[in-house]
C-alpha cells in the first residue's frame, strides 16, 4: 500500500471518491476532515496511484497506543473490487490485528475478505449493520476544492424563527464541558475510552445542542471523524416537543452552508427514527452502513 501525504494527491483522491458515493462515503467523509486540518491525525493508504482499487483510512501509528481502544483503532475502507480485498486486509502492516479494532464501510461485500483476514490472524469478528441515510445533495455531489471547513465555534446565533418557535430553548454549540453528559447517555459509550473519544469529537468537529429552561442541554447531536452525524439524544422530560427535529434542521442548514458533507445511520428496527429521518429530507441509500468489530483471541469480550 502507498501512503498518500501530498495535499494535491489527497485532493485528487477526494474528487475521485465523489464519483463512487454512496459506497465511498465513509472514506470520503474521513478524507474531508483530513483535508481540513486532520484533527484526528489520520492517514490515507491506496493500493496504487493514480489508478487505485482500494482506499484505507486509519489513525497514524502514534494514535493507536491503546490495544483496547476500539473508538480510536478504526479503519475506514472503500474498494472498487471488494472480493479481492483479503490479501491487503490480512497484512499486519496494514491492519494491526493484535488490537481490538473496528473496520467501517458501506460495502457488505467487504465482509468476506475481512472475516478471512481476521481468521488468518486468529481474530473474532462481530458484524453489525444499519440503514444509511443521505441527502439528495450528497447523491449529486461533485467534488470541489472550494469546500472550506468553518469554525463551529463561530456558528453565530439561533435563527429568529427558531427562537420564536422555542422561546424557552436556545440553540448552542455543544462544547467539551458536556462530554460527560453525552457519554453517560450514549449506548455505545459509558466508559473512560468513549469519554476520551467524545472529548476529541466535541473539541474538533461540529456538535450542537438545545439548551432547556434550566440552561443545560436537553437535546444534542455530534459528528464523528468520518462526517457521520450521531450520538443524538433528547432528555426524556423534553421529548416529543420537536426540539430534536429543530436541532437537526439547524445543524443541516449550517453544514450545508459550510459545504461539510454529512450522513446518518439508523438501525432497521427503529421505525420511528426512520420516519423522522425521512421527514427531515434524508433518503435511504442504495447501500447500507456496515461495521466489523474485531477482537484478538486474548481480548475477546466475555
From Swiss-Prot:
Reactions that this protein is recorded to catalyse: an acyl-CoA + L-glutamine = an N(2)-acyl-L-glutamine + CoA + H(+)
Q: Which Pfam families does the entry link to? A: Gly_acyl_tr_C, Gly_acyl_tr_N
Q: Does the keyword Repeat apply?
A: no
According to the UniProt entry, its GO molecular function terms are: glutamine N-acyltransferase activity; glycine N-acyltransferase activity
Record's Gene Ontology CC terms?
A: mitochondrion
Classification via InterPro entries? Acyl_CoA_acyltransferase, Glycine_N-acyltransferase, Glycine_N-acyltransferase_C, Glycine_N-acyltransferase_N
Identify the EC number(s): 2.3.1.68
- GO biological process terms, semicolon-separated: glutamine metabolic process
Alphabetically list the UniProt keywords: Acyltransferase, Transferase
Family assignment from sequence similarity: Belongs to the glycine N-acyltransferase family.
Q: What does this protein do?
A: Putative acyltransferase which transfers an acyl group to the N-terminus of glutamine. Can use phenylacetyl-CoA as an acyl donor.
Which protein are we looking at? Putative glycine N-acyltransferase-like protein 1B
Q: Which organism is it from?
A: Homo sapiens
Underlying gene: GLYATL1B
Amino acid at each position: 500500500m502507498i501512503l498518500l501525504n501530498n495535499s494535491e494527491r489527497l485532493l485528487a483522491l477526494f474528487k475521485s471518491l465523489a464519483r463512487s458515493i454512496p459506497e465511498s462515503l465513509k472514506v470520503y467523509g474521513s478524507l474531508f476532515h483530513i483535508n481540513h486540518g486532520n484533527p484526528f491525525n489520520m492517514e490515507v493508504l491506496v493500493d496504487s496511484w493514480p489508478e487505485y482499487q482500494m482506499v484505507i483510512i486509519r489513525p497514524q501509528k502514534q494514535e493507536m497506543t491503546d490495544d483496547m481502544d476500539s473508538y480510536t483503532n478504526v479503519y475506514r475502507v472503500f474498494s472498487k473490487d471488494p472480493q479481492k480485498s483479503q490479501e491487503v486486509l490480512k497484512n499486519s502492516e496494514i491492519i494491526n490485528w493484535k488490537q481490538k479494532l473496528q473496520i467501517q464501510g458501506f460495502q457488505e461485500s467487504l465482509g468476506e475478505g475481512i472475516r478471512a483476514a481476521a481468521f488468518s490472524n486468529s481474530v473474532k469478528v462481530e458484524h453489525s449493520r444499519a440503514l444509511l441515510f443521505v441527502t439528495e445533495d450528497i447523491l449529486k455531489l461533485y467534488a470541489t476544492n472550494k469546500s472550506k471547513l468553518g469554525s463551529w465555534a463561530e456558528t453565530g446565533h439561533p435563527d429568529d424563527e427558531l427562537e420564536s418557535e422555542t422561546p424557552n430553548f436556545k440553540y448552542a454549540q455543544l462544547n467539551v464541558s458536556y462530554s460527560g453528559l453525552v457519554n453517560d447517555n450514549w449506548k455505545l459509550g459509558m466508559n473512560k475510552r468513549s469519554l476520551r473519544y467524545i472529548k476529541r469529537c466535541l473539541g474538533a468537529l461540529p456538535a450542537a445542542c438545545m439548551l432547556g429552561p434550566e440552561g443545560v442541554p436537553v437535546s444534542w447531536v455530534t459528528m464523528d471523524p468520518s462526517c457521520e452525524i450521531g450520538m443524538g439524544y433528547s432528555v426524556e422530560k423534553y421529548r416529543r416537543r420537536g426540539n430534536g427535529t429543530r436541532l437537526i434542521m439547524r445543524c443541516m442548514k449550517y453544514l450545508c452552508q459550510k459545504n461539510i458533507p454529512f450522513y446518518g445511520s439508523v438501525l432497521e428496527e427503529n421505525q420511528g427514527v426512520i420516519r423522522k429521518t425521512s421527514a427531515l429530507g434524508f433518503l435511504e441509500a442504495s447501500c447500507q452502513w456496515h461495521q466489523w468489530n474485531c477482537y484478538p483471541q486474548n481480548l475477546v469480550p466475555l
